[in-house]
Curated annotation (Swiss-Prot):
Its EC number is 2.1.1.182. Belongs to the class I-like SAM-binding methyltransferase superfamily. rRNA adenine N(6)-methyltransferase family. RsmA subfamily. The keyword RNA-binding applies. It catalyses: adenosine(1518)/adenosine(1519) in 16S rRNA + 4 S-adenosyl-L-methionine = N(6)-dimethyladenosine(1518)/N(6)-dimethyladenosine(1519) in 16S rRNA + 4 S-adenosyl-L-homocysteine + 4 H(+). The gene is rsmA. S-adenosyl-L-methionine binds at H11, L13, G44, E65, D90, N106. GO terms for cellular component: cytosol. Specifically dimethylates two adjacent adenosines (A1518 and A1519) in the loop of a conserved hairpin near the 3'-end of 16S rRNA in the 30S particle. May play a critical role in biogenesis of 30S subunits. This is Ribosomal RNA small subunit methyltransferase A. HAMAP family: 16SrRNA_methyltr_A. It comes from the Bacteria. The keyword Transferase applies. SMART domains: rADc (SM00650).
Amino acid sequence: MPYPRKRFGQHWLKDPAVHEAILRAAQLNDLERGADPTWVLEIGPGTGQLTRRLLAQGVQVVAVEIDRDLCRLLRKRFADQPRFHLVEGDFLRLPLPPQPRLLVANIPYNLTGSILEKVLGSPAQPVRQFERIVLLVQKELAERLQAGPGSKAYGALSLRTQYLADCELICRVPPTAFKPAPKVESAVIRLTPRPAPTPVRDPCWFNHLLRQGFSTRRKKLVNALGSLVEREVVAAALAQLRLNPDARAEELDLPHWLALSDLLLEKAPKRAVVPQEEQEPG
């Protein structure tokens, strides 16, 4: 069996209880099935431990793997499985396969942000292909994704993710569940993309406002957003929303951020210009 490669951020998940937790979180039986079996996308199948369990559920598995040695192992291991479809390559450089509506993955932690953006999209361009996304991620990131107002983990990433999907922490995973053991704790999360995110007048402006608001999170919003909109305009918008005039970015929930975005766009349209690099998801 190939040894985990550091350059690919590989850590084999060896705890069968965590594999079972991922399967339960995927809720395969709850997906609406037509005449054909459900298609599942697995990013980074590794040695195929989770793949084997998925195939046992009767689903079609599209597995994307970048490691050539692992691809050879997987082809040999699942040679007699007509429902196993291997794609060799870098997931971030490949188009999304059109069939899967469920995604599961134990992914390199340094690529989690880029992978999330690819499978969820952005406020301006949501991806609505998947009914459910189950990921094994660093515990710190899991806490950020599901964090609420007032917590240290709450930030622009929390709001962008929650705008696009419901996020649940399924279970925590200790380093001992992997080989080799990583230096951090992990967690299984389930993302349920929203079929139609809450309308906002200008999603690019909303995204830009979040970045600016949380770039100096200890500042009051009237100051943090001062480079975009006059302080008096921000203060008036907060008052209209019946929010604390001294509020900081971390104190507003998602509905208030959406409302604030629309109000500031309306009150200061000439200043509400989004930098070109933020107009499209990267």
